């Protein structure tokens, strides 16, 4: 009777069967971040978009390499159609942003009593962007960011920046495809190893703990999202 690879070894044996699968991979390098920025700027120039605001989160990370979670405080970057990116953040976060910075650029800080949206308008003006220019807002940005910028200057032609971000992100580089494929390969190996150590009476928390260890064994930091249900 076949077991389809389920319950054929102990958890220790299953972990021992795994090894680091990331040693031959090349992480996204600075030149690729610069290429992403250049691609976005070329699209912006061709479509008459003067600048885009990148909010903390996936788009900020994709174009600048800076990993920062969105919160109730404005943290992001302004990418003009021509010129260098500039970051905007609470003044007290500037040191931390410098620690996480991958693509260099000035950080414009705002104090708690100041209006961060007015600072955005000032930065755009310093970039040479007219107060009637076209500004793309990150599609993942909270409404209060759009609202704040619009109140600081109601003359902008504000558009959804998704036309820029999606245009860039949906077309993957060879290195991106290799990283994505390896991530899927790693996940599949973890699934196989997990199936192989299942036994009658095992709990969901034990399986979840194994999955975390298995991901670490193949070279990942651990689980990003894991739910085990029987």
Predicted regions and their residues:
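Hydrophobic pocket-lining residues that define ligand/cofactor binding sites across diverse proteins
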Residues: 44, 198, 215
